[in-house]
Amino acid sequence: MGMGMEKGMTAYEAARERTVEENKRKMEALNLRHLSAAIAVAPKTPSPMKQKRRRIIEAAVVAPSPPRRSRRLANLPEVKYAEVAPDGAERMKRSPRKAIDSIYLATRGSISMEARLEAARKAEELESQLDPEFPSFVKPMLHSHVVRGFWLGLPRHFCETYLPKHDAIVTLLDEKDEQFDTNYLAYKNGLSGGWAGFALDHGLLDGDATVFQLVKPTTFKVHIIRATVDDGNEVTK
């Protein structure tokens, strides 16, 4: 830089220009100026690590790995959630009560209120002829007693007066004196296990009437009055 140029500059500009010239001489001495130019024009090549990572990501998108499962479930068959409409047989398995109802109605026929009342009237007449020494009551049969559930509730006042205050085995005697043991549940005032066997074995149907006569502390003699269907024929076993 000549002295004439420095005379036309301020002190700050002159000092800055001298610093720039000094830096240029240092870069030329170390050959850094040509190296920086070569770097500027060199083509950019992608990093091999970035390429590898991109390939891994793309492969994961195309072929996803199976979901992780615990060791306890690893050997179990895969659960499929496809909804398939059940066929008729499967629907029958899921709703056995409807099938039982259909069979029952087909074999029983329809029962009118008059037939129910007539069976109950005959049962009351029979009860009036029994030995009053042994307490008794009339129990008309309902659908829940002989088809669904097979739970037979007994009159509460009778249970509180004559039956045990705790659960017990109550024996039922039919007209042939055959014995059937049932489970008496004191807190529910009714017969559970064993009653179904008695009802099915004797062909009890909705609308029939029964007379329970307590001949021993935990033994009933059971008399059965059959109801009649609408065609006037009495239903038998």
Curated annotation (Swiss-Prot):
PROSITE patterns listed in its UniProt record: B3 (PS50863)
Alphabetic keyword roster: DNA-binding, Nucleus, Transcription, Transcription regulation
One Pfam family this sequence matches: B3
Record carries keyword Metal-binding: no
Transcription regulation found in the keyword field: yes
Known DNA-binding region: 137-228
Subcellular location(s) per record: Nucleus
Domain of life the protein comes from: Eukaryota
GO MF annotation terms: DNA binding
Record-level GO cellular component terms: nucleus
Chief site of localization: nucleus
Entry protein name: B3 domain-containing protein Os03g0184500
